[in-house]
Structure formats: C-alpha cells, structure tokens
Amino acid sequence: MRSAIFAAIALTISTALAGPESDSEVAARKAALDLAGAFTNEGFKMRDGHWTGTIKPKEHALIAVNLYAGNQYWFSVGATEPAKKISVNVYDETGKLMETESYSEGDKAAAGFSPTNSGQYYVLVDLVEGDASSVCLVYSYK
C-alpha cells in the first residue's frame, strides 16, 4: 500500500515537472524526426521516446543512453531558430570521445555509432552558432 502511494506521488511529480511541450520544442522534434527518417530507409528502427530542452550558447546538453554492443545507432538532433549550427558527439562512460559518422547541416545534426562494448554512453549536443534554441534528440538502432 505504502509503495503504491509513493509510486503515485512520484508519477504525479514527474508528470507535473515534465509539462506540455512548447511549440518550439514540437518544431525541434519535427526537425529531428525528419532527419531520423533518412535512417529508417536504411533499416534503422526509431527508439521510443525523445529528449527536448533549451540549449544556450557555450552550454551543452548531455544525455545518458544505454547502448548494446553489436547494434548500430544514429543520434539525430533538430533545433529551432535562432540556432544556426549544432553538433552531436558520443562519449563513453570514462569521457572518451567516440569515433562517429557525422552529419551536420545548420540546425540539424546526427552522429552514427556502433559500440564495441555494452554500457552507458553520453550524447553531447552543442550549440555551435546562434542563440538559445529548443532542441530535440531522437535515436534509432539496428
């Protein structure tokens, strides 16, 4: 009984904190999904869920992800105006920059990665040029 109450409280708090997405966040998600669509044509499946937020100049968004050896991943990011250029990088749990295939065109960027070890990795989204903007990260795998 007690754990059910705590679970209900935790769900209420997380739902309240999440709140509805702004129009800008929805536009960033659309841009990320448009980019990720190119990878679904190559057999990649979209992972459920996404991450949205605001990124400012000289600040980074760091998102932890669990990846499995033997899979291939594409991390796709879309941003809204006034972002002019964004980048995506992948780091292992020790902070080592991983070698990735990369794509970047203005307010959209992607990084392709195939881990040799399963575990936690970090995706770093960086606003290279422009002012504070909404961004969205989605990823796909095969």
Feature locations, PLM:
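Hydrophobic h-region of N-terminal signal peptides that target proteins for export
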Residues: I9-A18
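Acidic, Ser/Thr/Pro-rich low-complexity intrinsically disordered segments
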Residues: P20-E21, G49-S134, S140-K142
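Predominantly extracellular/luminal regions of secreted and cell-surface proteins
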Residues: G19-F44
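Generic detector of short alpha-helix boundary/capping microenvironments
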Residues: F6-A7, A31, M46, I63, ...
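Short amphipathic alpha-helical segments, especially helix-boundary/capping motifs
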Residues: T12, V26, G37-F39, D48-W51, ...
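Positively charged n-region of N-terminal signal peptides that target proteins for export
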Residues: M1-I5
